[in-house]
């Protein structure tokens, strides 16, 4: 997408967002960014270290794409606990149809192995209904996730954006997404599995349906409100303008309506079990 306005948050802005989240009771923070030269490793190390120093009782999750092993090690030593890197597809041919020629499935899987070896709680996952995806591809993904045994599984429906090469492809199917979510929950009872914003974008009750299908994580947006609209991954993205506090109140009401309560604890995955303090 060459028409989107890209942005980078300064360390002071990120820390301010974390302070607001901490005030609201959040004890885990997710820092997500594109695979771009603007996201310098040294600056990220400093930011992670600053968050760790300010919030020693919080979990720090990074989602910054493919990096060198050295970079992953430096982030970990600075204080990061978790890293989310969706493998997206385990089929080599399908992977090449989704990515630029300079990217490879083998390197992405190598990154996942590095992350696990370093000691991160590692997340991987898929996009359901991505262009050219088949049922056989999904079976390969299920088998890979069973072998890899991630602590986190990120998955949601594909949603097109009008300024991308895949703009003409239909969105992923809600029911198939929910079925796969349930399969992963049965396979991995303690895994952290988010009910993604993409679900809420595909259907008004998508987030609640995701929770009922087996998701156990939701991620309110703490980014500065003036930047959120620029984070345009797909068309009609849900909640681009809601403030964090307003979003939390709405979220608590939504979950209460289906019989759930919000826990703001770290939710660490230890020895195959999810630990949450009540």
What are these language model-derived features?
Residues 68-77, 130-145, 200-213:
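Catalytic cores of alpha/beta
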Residues 38, 70, 92, 132, ...:
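Generic structural signal for helix capping and beta-alpha/helix-loop junctions
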Residues 111-160:
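Aromatic-anchored, glycine/proline-accented short structural segments
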Residues 1-15, 21-42, 47-48, 52-112, ...:
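Core AdoMet radical
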Residues 39-64, 102-123, 148, 168-191, ...:
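Alpha-helix-loop-beta-strand connector modules within alpha/beta enzyme cores
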Residues 31, 85, 115, 145, ...:
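Conserved, mostly hydrophobic/aromatic
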Residues 146-278:
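Auxiliary Fe-S-binding modules of radical SAM enzymes
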Residues 35-40, 101, 129-134, 166, ...:
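Short, small-residue-enriched loops and turns at beta-alpha junctions
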């Amino acid at each position: 997408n060459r028409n989107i306005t890209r942005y980078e948050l300064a360390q002071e802005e990120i820390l301010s967002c974390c302070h607001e989240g901490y005030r609201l009771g959040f004890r885990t923070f997710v820092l997500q960014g594109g695979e771009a030269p603007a996201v310098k490793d040294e600056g990220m190390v400093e930011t992670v270290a600053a968050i760790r120093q300010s919030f020693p009782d919080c979990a720090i999750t990074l989602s910054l794409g493919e990096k060198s092993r050295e970079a992953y090690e430096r982030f970990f030593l600075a204080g990061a606990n978790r890293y989310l890197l969706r493998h997206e597809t385990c089929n080599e041919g399908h992977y090449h149809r989704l990515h630029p020629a300079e990217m490879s499935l083998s390197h992405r899987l190598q990154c996942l192995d590095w992350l696990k070896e370093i000691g991160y709680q590692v997340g991987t996952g898929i996009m359901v209904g991505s262009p050219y995806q088949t049922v056989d591809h999904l079976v390969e993904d299920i088998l890979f996730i069973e072998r890899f045994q991630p602590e986190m599984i990120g998955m949601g429906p594909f949603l097109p954006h009008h300024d991308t090469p895949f703009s003409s492809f239909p969105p992923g199917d809600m029911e198939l997404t929910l079925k796969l979510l349930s399969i992963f929950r049965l396979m991995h009872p303690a895994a952290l599995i988010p009910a993604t914003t993409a679900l809420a974008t595909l259907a008004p009750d998508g987030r609640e349906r995701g929770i009922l299908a087996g998701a156990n994580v939701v991620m309110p947006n703490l980014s500065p409100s003036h930047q959120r609209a620029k984070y345009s991954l797909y068309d009609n993205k849900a909640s681009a303008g809601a403030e964090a506090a307003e979003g939390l109140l709405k979220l608590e009401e939504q979950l209460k309506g289906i019989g759930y309560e919000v826990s703001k604890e770290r939710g660490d995955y230890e020895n195959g079990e999810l630990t949450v303090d009540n």
